[in-house]
From Swiss-Prot:
Changing residue 193 to A: Does not lead to constitutive homotrimerization and DNA-binding activities at 20 degrees Celsius. Leads to constitutive homotrimerization and DNA-binding activities at 30 degrees Celsius. Residues 203-224 are annotated as: D domain. It comes from Homo sapiens. Changing residue 303 to G: Leads to constitutive transactivation activity at room temperature. Inhibits interaction with YWHAE and increases cytoplasmic localization. This is Heat shock factor protein 1. Changing residue 298 to R: Abolishes sumoylation. No effect on phosphorylation of S-303 nor of S-307. No change in subcellular location to nuclear stress granules upon heat shock. Loss of colocalization with SUMO1 to nuclear stress granules upon heat shock. Changing residue 323 to D: Decreased HSF1-induced expression of HSPA1A mRNA in a IER5-dependent manner.
Length: 529
């Protein structure tokens, strides 16, 4: 309940009621014990806020809340004055609160008009600040549209690059798959070609077989790929012929069939009547082998290292004629001497006893005149042994060089090469002839190239088994075999081969023709028309 303001405290009518009541309350001397002016008159003090709220506030206001009174003072701009002694932690002995306002002064009531209540004023923006210029908006929209277009262009480019990247990855995967498959096929082809080269060169077979030229007590080892042959008589008559059953190849290597001083090749041909003459080199051993056909083995002492000689003996003349004989001359002499009569042909029969002959007329029976003997002198055993050792060393070096590359043949890989897993379009391979030639050139740098005629002439080229044993060559009586046989003697085959060329190496070393593994082209029989 508001108390009536005294006549001295009457103020202008535009002063708020709160300020008028506050002026009267502060100026009332009855309430100086609780509220009064400061000594300077610029502020007022409130003592004992609790008692002031209970006793004084209800008389002038409708409430007795000190907090509401302080809040109204703040609304009109009054500020609380804080002294130094009141700002510490120690509570002051007297509860004293001082408020001041620049226009609330003692004795100057007219200044109350200047005290205004604070109004929560929101700063009103000016219209020119709120209004945005149209050109700025247009420019902003243009920039936004431009940025949007650039973004769409970048998105399209990124999408195109993404598609291209996916296509490239798919192509890379396809190429990798094709490359792996092609590499697999190439590896299989290389392994297959290497296996062919290895089979042609007889790689991986290392033999250390004694020559057994001097050892007649031990039998030679049988060849790995041997077939049972038999030499059968056609004519049983003759000074050296004896009926005997067909013998196999095992009898050829019997210990008693090898002379103590080395094997001697002898040939018996039909000639005109001539008297035999003793040869100065030795005597003829006419011992027939057990179960063997007509064979003559001549024992002679080792000859000096020179070309073989032919000893032509006649019993009517005491002198002997020694002439240098090359294998070509020997074959030519045999061919010339066999012109009057059909040439001697070896009839080969297998283990079952079948003889391969043609329907040709047999040769006339041999006459009772003495026969002319042509014998090839024994080669020097040391020279032949050195030659075989050199060839063995060369083969070992070649095998070591080829094995150092670490080639391995996988049979399963070779079987998979022709399996249905590899389709026909995938087998588009390069030229196999050039690849095989290049691989052979790389694998065998030390081997001289052979002429193509020698390779094509042999049906079993590349499948021969080299056998380092000294085997005697047996030449049969021309009268004891059929002239219509398909197989010619060994010396007839050597006459037309490429082994005896015009070079010095071939003329001086006739053992090459005896040790080679491939067969030369067979000579045509001059007696067969």
């Amino acid at each position: 309940m508001d108390l009536p303001v005294g006549p001295g405290a009457a103020g202008p009518s535009n002063v708020p009621a709160f300020l008028t009541k506050l002026w009267t309350l502060v100026s009332d001397p009855d309430t100086d014990a609780l509220i009064c002016w400061s000594p300077s008159g610029n502020s007022f003090h409130v003592f004992d806020q609790g008692q002031f709220a209970k006793e004084v506030l209800p008389k002038y206001f409708k409430h007795n809340n000190m907090a509401s009174f302080v809040r109204q003072l703040n609304m009109y701009g009054f500020r609380k004055v804080v002294h130094i002694e009141q700002g510490g932690l120690v509570k002051p002995e007297r509860d004293d609160t001082e408020f001041q306002h620049p226009c609330f002064l003692r004795g100057q009531e007219q200044l109350l008009e200047n005290i205004k209540r604070k109004v929560t004023s929101v700063s009103t923006l000016k219209s020119e600040d709120i209004k945005i210029r149209q050109d700025s908006v247009t420019k902003l929209l243009t920039d936004v549209q431009l940025m949007k277009g650039k973004q769409e262009c970048m998105d399209s480019k990124l999408l195109a690059m993404k598609h291209e990247n996916e296509a490239l990855w798919r192509e890379v995967a396809s190429l990798r798959q094709k490359h792996a498959q092609q590499q697999k096929v190439v590896n299989k082809l290389i392994q297959f070609l290497i296996s062919l080269v290895q089979s042609n060169r007889i790689l991986g077979v290392k033999r250390k077989i004694p020559l057994m030229l001097n050892d007649s007590g031990s039998a030679h080892s049988m060849p790995k790929y041997s077939r049972q042959f038999s030499l059968e008589h056609v004519h049983g008559s003759g000074p050296y012929s004896a009926p005997s059953p067909a013998y196999s190849s095992s009898s050829l290597y019997a210990p008693d069939a090898v002379a103590s001083s080395g094997p001697i090749i002898s040939d018996i041909t039909e000639l005109a009547p001539a008297s035999p003459m003793a040869s100065p080199g030795g005597s003829i051993d006419e011992r027939p082998l057990s179960s063997s056909p007509l064979v003559r083995v001549k024992e002679e002492p080792p000859s000096p290292p020179q070309s073989p000689r032919v000893e032509e003996a006649s019993p009517g003349r005491p002198s002997s004629v020694d002439t240098l004989l090359s294998p070509t001359a020997l074959i030519d002499s045999i061919l010339r001497e066999s012109e009057p009569a059909p040439a001697s042909v070896t009839a080969l029969t297998d283990a079952r006893g079948h003889t391969d002959t043609e329907g040709r007329p047999p040769s006339p029976p041999p006459t009772s005149t003495p026969e002319k003997c042509l014998s090839v002198a024994c080669l020097d055993k040391n020279e032949l042994s050195d030659h075989l050792d050199a060839m063995d060393s060369n083969l070992d070096n070649l095998q070591t060089m080829l094995s150092s590359h670490g080639f391995s043949v996988d049979t399963s890989a070779l079987l998979d090469l022709f399996s249905p897993s590899v389709t026909v379009p995938d087998m588009s391979l390069p030229d196999l002839d050039s690849s095989l030639a290049s691989i052979q050139e790389l694998l065998s740098p030390q081997e001289p190239p052979r002429p193509p005629e020698a390779e094509n002439s042999s049906p079993d080229s590349g499948k021969q088994l080299v056998h380092y044993t000294a085997q005697p060559l047996f030449l049969l009586d021309p009268g004891s075999v059929d002239t219509g046989s398909n197989d010619l003697p060994v010396l007839f085959e050597l006459g037309e081969g490429s082994y005896f060329s015009e070079g010095d190496g071939f003329a001086e070393d006739p053992t090459i023709s005896l040790l080679t593994g491939s067969e030369p082209p067979k000579a045509k029989d001059p007696t067969v028309s």
